[in-house]
């Protein structure tokens, strides 16, 4: 599995926990690592260069959570007849993360959208894939 795809999966898990628990995203990241590294000797410490840290996952989770209000407004403006709070939590966070990543402009939008659709196939359903594709396409086109 490609490293970036795995990082996106991990970021989605962190964002799901953050959204459901309303805890700070740093706490959700720490909880994720606690679960991932059940053996204390494998656990990353506070050093950013320690093996085992997933810097891309952390950047996606932190950046998405920091920009959530702006991103949510963009989602709402493109989703006709769908209030944000009525969207499934997984779908909402796939959208948030993809829109955040597109705003960074480091990865081509087509790649970000394809990755988001793959996450939707893994963690949601086919109806969600179509819905997410439509929203992301509309956001990308402006």
Question: Which positions does each model-derived feature cover?
Answer:
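N-terminal interaction/assembly modules
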Residues: 1-129, 133-142
